[in-house]
């Protein structure tokens, strides 16, 4: 008895058919190539779990993300796949335990025959059996253990996939809202440009009626107006496509999306295209880019090794590799003998010839099965499992490289956008000075209205470039959070987008003199 009790854990634990899994060696850079402040991995927080998008301070993003997290088919599929993997892991764990079943049967039979001297003899018999049965596979070679490990690895992979789907969804919504805000501002610029060109065409036609210009001048003005209207139509289509994208992601109606995104995040609507009392057409009032596009707070990353290995896509690929490694052990164990403990306890009831009898039977033992000849199928299964593991390792290496590239691209984009913001603001200020000077010259009769309107268009275009740079900076910030898998550090003293907007409540109003 003592020997049996000592042997039982060994039988349950089994003999390993291969070494324990070790994560493949992954090459990562010692530091980020683009300039970024690195912090210890312990100081980074998982912003993916902390509603990172709220750091932008954009109510439209907050509302659409909240709707998408409860009603997005892609995310729902990822969660369903995670639940499937959890169920499969439960099945694999259950297979390592004894399987107990209840077996029973009821039969009634009649037999008849001819007996010498007594004629025909008919006998009716009724019988019933009922009892439990037990079957328990001894995991001698770790087949069941490796099967459970493979299922656990896939559960971890699907969990990471769900986290990646959630991060990707929230990032797509934030990116689309930023693009839609910039698109609306760009559309307003084109509306004002069309209004200016319509006035120019009217003036040209009036001058043509007095013989002051050649017919080619109104024709050129009409051509420019048609081109501007075509550009506006294309911009309207681009804005509509972004709205459709947000509808598909968040499940909200297009009208709701437009209502949410039309005002600026700071609550100030874009200036209307109304006429000015001092000139035929007023330029778009100066609007600070931070009032149209949220100014994201600064963030820091851990070193590449810590950041990349915690990325959900990398985690999913690594856990899939672990599952494939375990399946090699399963394939090896399938070629070895298998021992099952079986037991049966049956109660029997029989009635025949008017008498009834009942009795119990039991049996216990072990069943041995082993492949003798399979035509090489077992060896082929092992080679296939090994090839699938190598494929998973290469997928893991690719996931690390892709994540590193995405982080570096986002860092480069953020730096470029930050520099363009500075230069575009200088361009806006210079264009404003030129516009005000030309307005004064136009009132004094020193320049024509066409020269004035050209300076207006330059000012509007400079503002549009500033908004585009602010959009690119915010998009790069979103891309950086996504590329880092949400594992970033945000200084406690760093202001959020809403803090910056609330500190300048009057920005976005006209600042003309």
Predicted segments, located by residue:
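Periplasmic alpha-helical coiled-coil/stalk elements that build and connect Gram-negative outer-membrane
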Residues: 144, 153, 160-303, 413, ...
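Alpha-helical heptad-repeat coiled-coil segments that mediate oligomerization/polymerization in large
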Residues: 211-214, 403, 410, 445-448
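Small/polar (Gly/Ser/Thr/Ala-rich) solvent-exposed segments
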Residues: 76, 96-124, 135-164, 183, ...
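Hydrophobic, lipid-facing positions within transmembrane beta-strands of outer-membrane proteins
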Residues: 128-134, 176, 303, 362-366
């Amino acid at each position: 008895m003592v020997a049996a009790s000592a042997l039982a854990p060994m039988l349950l634990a089994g003999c390993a058919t291969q070494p324990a899994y070790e994560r493949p060696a992954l090459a990562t850079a010692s530091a980020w190539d683009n300039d970024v402040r690195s912090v210890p991995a312990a100081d980074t927080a998982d912003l993916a779990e902390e509603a990172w998008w709220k750091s932008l301070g954009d109510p439209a993003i907050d509302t659409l993300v909240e709707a998408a997290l409860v009603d997005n088919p892609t995310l729902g599929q990822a969660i369903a796949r995670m639940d499937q993997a959890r169920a499969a892991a439960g099945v694999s764990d259950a297979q390592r335990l004894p399987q107990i079943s209840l077996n029973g049967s009821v039969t009634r039979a009649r037999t008849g025959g001819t007996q010498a001297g007594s004629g025909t003899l008919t006998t009716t018999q009724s019988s019933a059996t009922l009892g439990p049965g037990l079957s328990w596979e001894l995991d001698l070679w770790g087949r069941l253990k490796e099967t459970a490990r493979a299922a656990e690895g896939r559960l971890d992979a699907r969990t990471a996939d769900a986290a990646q789907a959630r991060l990707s969804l929230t990032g797509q919504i934030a990116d689309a809202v930023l693009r839609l805000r910039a698109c609306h501002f760009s559309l307003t610029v084109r509306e004002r440009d069309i209004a200016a060109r319509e006035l120019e065409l009217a003036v040209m036609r009036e001058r043509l009626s007095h013989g002051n210009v050649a017919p080619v001048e109104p024709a050129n003005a009409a051509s420019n107006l048609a081109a501007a209207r075509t550009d506006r139509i294309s911009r309207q289509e681009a804005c509509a496509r972004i709205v459709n994208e947000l509808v598909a992601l968040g499940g909200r109606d297009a009208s709701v999306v437009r209502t949410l995104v039309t005002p600026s995040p700071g609550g100030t609507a874009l200036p209307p295209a109304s006429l000015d009392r001092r000139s035929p057409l007023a330029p778009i009032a100066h609007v600070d880019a931070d009032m149209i596009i949220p100014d994201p707070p600064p963030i820091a990353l851990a070193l590449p090794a810590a950041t990349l290995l915690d990325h959900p896509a990398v985690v999913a690929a690594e856990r899939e590799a672990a599952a494939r490694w375990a399946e090699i052990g399963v394939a090896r164990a399938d070629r070895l003998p298998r021992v099952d403990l079986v037991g049966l306890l049956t109660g029997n009831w029989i009635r025949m010839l008017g008498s009834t009898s009942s009795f119990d039977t039991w049996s216990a033992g072990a069943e041995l099965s082993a492949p003798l000849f399979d035509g090489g199928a077992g060896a082929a299964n092992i080679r296939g499992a090994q090839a699938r593991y190598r494929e998973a390792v290469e997928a893991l290496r690719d996931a690390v490289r892709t994540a590193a590239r995405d982080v570096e691209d986002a860092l480069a984009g953020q730096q470029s956008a930050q520099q363009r913001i500075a230069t575009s603001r200088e361009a806006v200020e210079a264009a404003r000075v030129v516009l005000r000077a030309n307005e004064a010259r136009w009132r004094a009769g020193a320049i024509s209205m066409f020269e004035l309107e050209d300076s207006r268009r330059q000012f509007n275009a400079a503002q549009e470039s500033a908004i585009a740079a602010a959009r690119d900076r915010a998009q790069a910030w979103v891309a950086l959070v996504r590329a880092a898998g949400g594992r970033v550090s945000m200084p406690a003293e760093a202001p959020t987008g809403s803090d910056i907007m609330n500190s300048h409540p009057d920005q976005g109003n006209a600042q003309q003199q």
